[in-house]
Amino acid sequence: MYFCKRNLQNKIITYNMKNLKTIIFTACALFSLGAAASTEHTTVQGDHGKLDVVIQRPDNDAANDNGSQANAKAKAGKKTPLLVLCHGFGGNKEGKLFDCLVDSLNKKGIAVIRFDFNGHGKSEGKFEDMTVLNEIEDAKCILRYASSLPWVSKIAMGGHSQGGVVTAMTSGQLVAQADKDIKKIQAVVLLAPAAVLRDDALRGNTFGKMYDPKNPPAKIEMWDGKALGGNYIRTATTLPIYETAKNYHGAECILHGDADRVVPYTYGQRFHYLNKKSEWHLMTDADHGFGGQEEQAAHIASDFLAKVLK
């Protein structure tokens, strides 16, 4: 386990042949595991407990680590670019969109670290204690860990939905206040970034759950037994999303669907307006999760990262 400095088993997927939906959903996951010859599970100490982490490296890296001595010598000193991938609100590091992205990146020689934020997936912490701000701290812990890996060359960040907000704000913060233990963020990918979360909190409506934004309750019951803490709402109403994100002026790729009913695409487009070096991809008929277009979104993002990082 890696402990971040802070001031402030391979899993076999089984499915029922009668369940076509599950087969389609897991297809990219199977391809991803096949393409990533080296898959490592670990934990990293985050802001609110240990974070569950999966590192997936391309075939050439596995050969360098596990191949013949002659081959290892030939590849000695070769390093690999890496993407740190952040999931959205109430989600986790799994899912077809991320599986397709990992598969596409591994094929292009780029490694990926994906992880569960505090209170999500297999990571420690309570969901009701989660805020965007402590997710930013989680992301920085992962970035410090990634920066410490001897085989990593360049680092990029990417995120979907709230993970996109975390990515945008983290990359902006690290420009305004550099961290000596974190390598420079060379590229950013935002997938349907949910900057609407601040406006939702100000309206007193988060995923259909109504409340008084001026006096939020201690917690709000959401789904699957999860409760959203009042501190999430209080911090969200004053979250300087765009004000922080605008500090990052490096390579950036922003993807959004014009059929997104969770986060209108104009919220993603505003990130594009803030950065002259950014690419803007508005995908026709794509929803918030890019359902049915996951592979297309993954190829756009991976082509961009291959161009910037290799």
Show where each model-derived region lies.
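The serine-hydrolase catalytic nucleophile loop
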Residues: G90-V102, F117
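Alpha/beta-hydrolase active-site loop
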Residues: D129-L149
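N-terminal cap/lid segment of alpha/beta-hydrolase-fold proteins
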Residues: A37-G67, A72
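Conserved alpha/beta-hydrolase
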Residues: V102-E124
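The alpha/beta-hydrolase serine catalytic core
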Residues: L51, V165, T170-G172, D181-L282, ...
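Alpha/beta-hydrolase fold nucleophile elbow
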Residues: P150-S161
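Short beta-strand element of the alpha/beta-hydrolase
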Residues: K78-G88
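Short beta-to-alpha linker loops that shape the active-site pocket of alpha/beta-hydrolase fold enzymes
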Residues: F89, D116-K126, A194, A286
